[in-house]
Amino acid sequence: IVFSLPGTAGELTPAAPFIVEQTYEADYRTLIKGESGQVVINNPEAWFEGIVISDKDNANVETTPNSAPNATDYTVNAKTAYVQMLDGSYGYRVQFNSAADNTLERYSQVKISLNGVTLTKEADPERYTLSGLTAGNIVSQTPGTASDLIRKEKSIGQLTDEDIHTYVSLREVEFALPDGSYTNVNEGYFGTSNFVSCVPRTLYDKNGGTISMLVNNKTPWRRDGSGMPKGKGTLSGIIVHDLQPLSLIHISEPTRPLYI
């Protein structure tokens, strides 16, 4: 294409050619066409930006699997983070090779390189995990605050697969059994015998929707003597899949009354 610009006398003067370059962030979820699958991204130019919604030093980020009937792998929690898109439209579970590699601070805006990273898609519900990351995959990290998050407020029944691995505020929910502690089990099953690594607590709303809030056995506020919050309110957390189609991971202790 040849461009011409008008001169001072109205004549047209040929302009030097120039290139307009537009960059955009790709949706790497589209790399997997089937209902489920896995692909290794080998592209030095592959990256995405998002906001960290988990906390690297928090004990209630990922359910810790039982590697044997009486053994729990606690390293999984420390190696896991959740990063959602800047607009909150969807998110990834991010699994680092080691806890030392996971330096993602809550609310920070990050740019993550996907070169050499494995993308896994799982179905029913549809969700995505990025694994095999090291500290070197973190291109940049800028501190942020809770106000940087796009607020997504929904009822339990309005949740969809797109909400998985994003931060959502659930309206007018309450605990079905708000008595005792968050983990009403024998503590001996936790640290001594390692039979139990996580306890779900049921939340429900006025529309009959239910969802489990997951509490790991290393969570400091699981049993601190102050009991559980009673009454209806808004509870915020990360939507995940664990046994049930959708569950909620709460990073900090729910406030009393139940508003956060």
What is each stretch, according to the model?
Residues 54-93, 183-216:
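OB-fold (S1/OB) nucleic-acid-binding surfaces
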Residues 143-217:
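Short helix-loop boundary/capping segments
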Residues 4-22, 30-34, 76-98, 116-120, ...:
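Secreted, disulfide-rich extracellular signaling modules
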Residues 103-124, 168-175, 230-245:
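Flexible glycine-rich surface loops and low-complexity tracts that mediate binding to linear polymers
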Residues 1-72, 143-147:
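Acidic/polar, low-complexity intrinsically disordered N-terminal segments immediately downstream
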Residues 203-205, 209-247:
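Extracellular low-complexity, Gly/Ser/Thr-rich intrinsically disordered linkers
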Residues 84-156:
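Secretome/extracellular-domain signature
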Residues 249-260:
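Single conserved hydrophobic/aromatic residue that forms the stacking wall/gate
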